């Protein structure tokens, strides 16, 4: 999980999801997981 000021899609499998007011990227590639912080 990377914590970044700006989350971006890295590949075409990445999806931007908002959970409890937190922006996240979920992907089939675990290395692409990100959270805005």
Swiss-Prot record:
<dbReference type="GO" id="GO:0006412">
    <property type="term" value="P:translation"/>
</dbReference>
<dbReference type="GO" id="GO:1990904">
    <property type="term" value="C:ribonucleoprotein complex"/>
</dbReference>
<dbReference type="GO" id="GO:0005737">
    <property type="term" value="C:cytoplasm"/>
</dbReference>
<protein>
    <recommendedName>
        <fullName>Large ribosomal subunit protein bL36</fullName>
    </recommendedName>
</protein>
<comment type="similarity">
    <text>Belongs to the bacterial ribosomal protein bL36 family.</text>
</comment>
<dbReference type="InterPro" id="IPR035977">
    <property type="entry name" value="Ribosomal_bL36_sp"/>
</dbReference>
<dbReference type="InterPro" id="IPR000473">
    <property type="entry name" value="Ribosomal_bL36"/>
</dbReference>
<dbReference type="GO" id="GO:0003735">
    <property type="term" value="F:structural constituent of ribosome"/>
</dbReference>
<keyword id="KW-0689">Ribosomal protein</keyword>
<dbReference type="GO" id="GO:0005840">
    <property type="term" value="C:ribosome"/>
</dbReference>
<keyword id="KW-0687">Ribonucleoprotein</keyword>
<dbReference type="Pfam" id="PF00444">
    <property type="entry name" value="Ribosomal_L36"/>
</dbReference>
